[in-house]
Curated annotation (Swiss-Prot):
GO terms for molecular function: N-acylglucosamine-6-phosphate 2-epimerase activity. It comes from Yersinia pseudotuberculosis serotype O:3 (strain YPIII). One of its GO terms (cellular component) is cytosol. Belongs to the NanE family. Keywords: Carbohydrate metabolism, Isomerase. Converts N-acetylmannosamine-6-phosphate (ManNAc-6-P) to N-acetylglucosamine-6-phosphate (GlcNAc-6-P). This is Putative N-acetylmannosamine-6-phosphate 2-epimerase. SUPFAM superfamilies: Ribulose-phoshate binding barrel. The gene is nanE. It catalyses: an N-acyl-D-glucosamine 6-phosphate = an N-acyl-D-mannosamine 6-phosphate.
Length: 233
């Protein structure tokens, strides 16, 4: 089995932990990101999604588990945020990423999806498309991108849904894509539903690694219960 096939095999039917702290939070240091990654692997995760060169370097030093690497940028002339530039591809490969993920949505962008893909292939890394809908995903699949993620489904519109896009997982899987389900998988049951829908693997982020979000969910539920009690009287 080749190294690339071995990497694909490691991820199949597994959990990928996205270790991306809230920017600027108490957890937002490379050392803590690496610790979160190791804890996720100890819990059974088979791969990691890591943002930022320093974070990837820290995680690479700590483990040889598969890393999906991204760089997020806020550009003045494009809504594309995930790995928008060719130099990002080079930097991610040099930092130790095994798989390079990039936005493949049909929006104004500084570099074409095809050029990003070709640059990533030239590094020897596997590739992942962060798609928002079936058209994005199929275009990426036809280019030859290794994994198609549902990462951006619901995030290119004004209102973000609360539930994951399982229908998109099914559509892409039926089209022959290796689908990495991602986006709003906040419970084990939803992650299992993604695999049942045909996902190759499932990425979970906030529900595992963003303490602020998790605490917020609990606090909101408690407040809702308190409100319901008050309305009974």
């Amino acid at each position: 089995m080749s190294n690339l096939n071995n990497l694909r095999h490691k991820l199949q039917n597994g959990l990928i932990a996205s270790c991306q702290p809230v920017p600027g939070s108490a957890m937002d240091t490379p050392e803590i990101v690496a610790a979160m990654a190791c804890a996720a692997l100890a819990g059974g995760a088979v791969g990691l999604r890591i943002e930022g060169i320093n974070n990837i370097r820290a995680v690479r030093r700590a483990t040889d588990a598969p890393i999906i690497g991204i760089i997020k940028r806020d550009l003045p002339d494009s809504e594309v945020r995930i790995t928008p530039w060719l130099e990002d591809i080079d930097a991610l490969s040099a930092a130790g990423a095994d798989i390079i993920a990039f936005d493949v949505t049909c929006r104004e962008r500084p570099v074409s999806v095809a050029d990003l893909y070709q640059r990533a292939r030239a590094t020897g890394c596997l590739t992942m498309a962060d798609a928002s809908n079936i058209d994005d995903g199929l275009l990426a699949h036809h280019l030859g991108i290794d994994f198609i993620g549902t990462t951006l489904s619901g995030y290119t519109q004004a209102t973000v849904p609360t539930e994951p896009d399982l229908a998109l997982v099914t559509q892409l899987a039926q089209a022959g894509c290796r689908v990495i389900a991602e986006g709003r998988y906040h419970s084990p049951a939803l992650a299992a539903a993604a695999i049942s829908a045909g996902a190759y693997a499932v990425t979970v982020g906030s529900a595992i690694t963003r303490i602020e979000h998790i605490c917020g969910w609990f606090c909101d539920a408690i407040k809702q219960c308190e409100t319901e009690k008050l309305t009974e009287y």
